[in-house]
């Protein structure tokens, strides 16, 4: 029940600041499950007082078609912002296509979510984020990565199991944050998305402390 979730958050002095995850929004005939999940995300925004939803798209379509479907999703979302997250193994693999889709949708509530791991695994340099695009970035997620990626066929496995804490890998998390700041991004949320079996295996308390300490170091660098 809603009140039970709110009670848990209150007990631990926590706040939900981002809602996810809408997928398969480009399908002509969306399944009942996806329609329900979408409505649940809208409800979660209302419940937690969150203004944006993180969305991904695994299926690969043209910019024009994807933009039209994003426009329809944005219309259904109404007052909520739809944050499209480019991921290298997805149908929106990089900033270039993400920006083209968001721009072509023509929706004020269509925006981007940028993640360090997805950025570096798409082999993008830290100098391509323009002030124009920056205005359309709703939130960022920071972490780090190994120098060498997993093979392309299993790259998603690395994303879901083997990311690194900010500043502890080979990909210059501070450089990513500096790019974000220099471009003029004003993120609603700075998420720390360290999806790591090894770090979580240390225990919740240890994982939280380790991630927090390394994130703090990175943010102080910039």
Feature annotation, model-predicted:
Residues 168-183:
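A short, acidic, amphipathic alpha-helical segment used as a generic capping/interface helix at domain edges
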């Amino acid at each position: 029940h809603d009140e039970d979730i709110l009670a848990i958050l209150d007990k631990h002095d926590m706040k939900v600041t981002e809602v996810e995850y809408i997928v398969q929004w480009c399908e002509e005939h969306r399944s009942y499950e996806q329609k329900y999940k979408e409505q649940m995300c809208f409800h979660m925004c209302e419940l937690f007082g969150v203004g944006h939803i993180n969305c991904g798209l695994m299926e690969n379509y043209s910019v024009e078609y994807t933009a039209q479907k994003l426009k329809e999703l944005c219309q259904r979302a109404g007052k909520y912002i739809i944050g499209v997250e480019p991921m290298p193994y997805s149908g929106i693999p990089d900033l270039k296509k993400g920006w083209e889709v968001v721009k072509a949708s023509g929706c004020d509530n269509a925006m981007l979510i940028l993640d360090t791991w997805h950025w570096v695994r798409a082999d993008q340099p830290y100098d391509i984020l323009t002030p124009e695009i920056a205005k359309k970035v709703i939130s960022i997620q920071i972490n780090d990565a190994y120098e060498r990626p997993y093979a392309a066929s299993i790259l998603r496995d690395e994303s879901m199991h083997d990311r690194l804490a900010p500043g502890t890998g080979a990909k210059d998390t501070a450089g990513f944050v500096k790019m974000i700041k220099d471009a003029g991004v004003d993120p609603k949320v700075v998420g720390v998305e360290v999806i790591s079996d090894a770090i979580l295996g240390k225990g919740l308390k240890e994982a939280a402390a380790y991630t927090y300490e390394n994130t703090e170091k990175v943010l102080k660098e910039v």
